[in-house]
Amino acid sequence: MAFFSTVKARVFVLFFILLSNSVQAQKDQLVIPRDVRSAYEKGTRSPDGQPGANYWQNRAEYDIKAELIPAQRRLRGTQQIIYYNQSPDSLNRLVIRLYQDILKKGNLRDWPVNESDLHNGMVIERLLINGQSFDLSAGNETVTRSGTNLTIKLNQPISPGNQAIVEMDWYFTISRTSNIRMGAYDSTTFFIAYWYPQIAVYDDVNGWDTYNYSGIQEYYNDFNDFQVEITVPKNFMVWATGDLQNVSDVLAPEYVQRYQTGQISDTVLKVISEDDLARGGTTLYKDKLTWIYQAHNVPDFAFGSSDHYLWDMVSLVVDERAPRRVIINAVYNPQSADFYGVADISRKVLEFFSTRMPGVPYPYPVMTVFNGSGGMEFPMIVNNGSQSSFAGTVGLTAHEIAHTYFPFYMGINERKYAWMDEGWAVMLPWEFQSSMVENNDRLATTIVEFNFSSGKEMDLPLLTPSIVYSSHVHYPGYRFNSYTKAAVAYQILRELLGEDLFRQALHEFMRRWNGKHPLPWDFFFTFDAVAGENLSWFWNSWFIEPGYPDLGIGQVKQKSGKSEIEIIRHGNMVIPVQLRVVFDDDSEEIIKKSARVWQNSVERIIVPVKHKKKIKRLELGHIHIPDINRQNNTVTF
């Protein structure tokens, strides 16, 4: 795409490294697990970081008609899925995710729930595949329902290049108190996610993704098209993934005009105000209204609905070359004081992401921030709770919108590699957060959090599959690895490569893999290619091996006009060196060295300092550099 930097990558021939299955003999080699290695052998992945010549992925088209029944807290739906098998394999079964079975009585989950929210799971009233009806009652050997997966053995396999048509009628009860990323927030406010029966991912590494949805782990979806009709009672509005297709069929004419004006407005416009709610008549006078949304090439669909939410709208040109303008909505409870500024914050953060970091124009036509609870991302819409501080509102808004790029634009498998999206969502908005809130150094705060947990028992290597943390007991480890540790790793990589080369590599990774399913090794090899060097020593240190960062000052040899200062790497994680030399007149010199000095397993370096004055104090490190033990970082003479 035009907005990406042009990169002429110097690609190393690394086949012998990439396809190695033995324990590494040298620190500059990466080991690839057997199941992942097979993808490179089959040519679906390439050792230069590109999608392979034989790369493929499946997709689907969803046509969903759903009705929200607030009085019953029920969502009822009928849907048709056209599933396209673009793999080289004949598929003799289909795996369908029934996310709402997480609240099914007797099912395992790693998220605490209120017993009153437990139910019979997703109730499926009809299932047809290519016109064949399937009996879901117990004892049918062609159907297996386990955890949150429904697996159907097919009489006629789906051959390569062919498709299957899946038709279903279903309903479920919406949770009231155990709101795992969705639910009822009051009697007439709902956020609906993880809701429709969804065909699981079948990929080139593991075949069917059969991990159950247990609460902690989030996304791994194919890129699909959605046509969704959502029927709600009169006075209810619906905000969702995608473009609203029939605004004139649901809003009263006055509000249609406001909606259309807001689509091109550079200042925040109130589509629905408190006075409007008090007066009534914001929607057309019908007992039921059907809101129609379309979304193309996205990994999921979610929506929110309420009859008493305020609605602010503004827009932004995210790509001057197109030019392309994005609609930004904030919809919220009138009691949520912080949300009155969210539309403006969202516009500013979209501008930052589009032009600064990552510097890739926001890829979708809409962004809606819905005032529900917690903080959870979905394509083109996020579900955010109210925050007690402006810094909290800025941080949550920026973080959830950052997920647009990772995992949605990039198709990340969060179930296995949550650090490939959460870490970026922490790191990308740091500068924005600092610019919006005085004395809000989020990088420094993250380093403090990192230093507290790094090297402890729950600190596992980043490449540990996220599903390993599938227990609420293990959530602190999941949180540290996926968010804090990954964000710091990306920042150290940024410092190592320098700003320009880091951006080139990030842009190239995004250009190559947007709309696909990159693995960690695709990320590693792309950065190797763009950097023009084998960075395995860095990947091993930060992503593969257990460990922690700890630098200390060793021996100091002082001579006339020159001193030699020994810096010792006590920990095995590589970090940059920053040495502050304070002289007896309180003047100072700052010496910086890249983490590259620790390449080739170097454990100590000598930093020479030329000086005419007497050294009074040496201080190693910085608030932006992780180091779990600062006690060995200072020497006073």
Per-region residue spans from a language model:
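Beta-strand-rich binding/interaction modules
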Residues: 239-240, 304, 556-621
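Glycine/proline-rich low-complexity spacer/linker segments in large multi-domain proteins
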Residues: 106-117, 171-226, 247, 624-637
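Hydrophobic helix-coil surface modules that form long, contiguous segments used
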Residues: 201-203, 217-398, 427
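Short, hydrophobic/aromatic-enriched beta-strand segments in well-ordered soluble domains
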Residues: 79-81, 96-100, 154, 162-176, ...
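Hydrophobic alpha-helical and helix-loop surface patches within well-folded domains
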Residues: 25-47, 58-60, 293, 327-568
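A surface-exposed beta-strand-loop module
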Residues: 84, 112-188, 276-286, 290, ...
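Solvent-exposed beta-hairpin/edge-strand motifs
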Residues: 91-136, 193, 231-236, 582-592
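Early extracytoplasmic/domain-onset interaction patches
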Residues: 28-97
